[in-house]
């Protein structure tokens, strides 16, 4: 990490090596800026198919949209690429992965985001999923919501408990 910092290459892509993080990455940007309205849905579907293929076989998939779960007001806008669709989360889950997704906290009460997550958990496509949520409470507030497969739930709960008991514990709270 020091080498990356000292080189001036402080970009996420610099961390995407097995020497630093033993993980699979799909970092293809979904951009609608020059895409006509009628073509956005197909472009998104193609992008998502590539993401599914790249992440097939992963036990945990972390989804990091700019804003979080899709809201109705953004679904048809050029900014729809800043959100993840529930169907996309369900696809990763059905592929065998537990899913963690990022949610930026905008000007809504906590209950709005909890309700969104609970609504996902009620969907029959992930009926066996266990939900978990972490709220980052420092600076800009954000959530990390979990859709856990039964075979991963206990291990992830233990890891979250360890995080909360450690030096980062004061920065998070369970939702």
Regions picked out by a protein language model, each given a short descriptive name:
Residues 1-175:
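Class I S-adenosyl-L-methionine-dependent methyltransferase catalytic core
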């Amino acid at each position: 990490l020091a080498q990356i910092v000292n080189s001036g290459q402080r970009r996420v892509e610099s961390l995407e090596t097995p020497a630093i993080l033993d993980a699979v990455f799909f970092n293809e940007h979904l951009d609608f800026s020059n895409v006509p309205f009628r073509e956005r849905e197909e472009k998104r579907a193609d992008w998502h198919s590539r993401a599914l293929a790249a992440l097939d076989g992963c036990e945990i998939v972390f989804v990091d949209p700019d804003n979080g779960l899709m809201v109705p007001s953004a679904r048809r806008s050029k900014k729809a690429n800043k959100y993840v669709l529930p169907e996309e989360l369900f696809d990763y889950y059905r592929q065998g992965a537990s899913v963690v997704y990022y949610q930026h906290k905008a000007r809504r009460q906590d209950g709005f985001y909890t309700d969104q997550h609970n609504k996902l958990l009620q969907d029959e496509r992930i009926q066996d999923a266990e939900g978990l949520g972490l709220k980052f409470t420092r600076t800009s507030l954000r959530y990390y919501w979990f859709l856990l497969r039964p075979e991963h739930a206990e291990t992830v709960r233990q890891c979250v408990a360890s995080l909360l008991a450690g030096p980062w514990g004061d920065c998070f709270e369970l939702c």
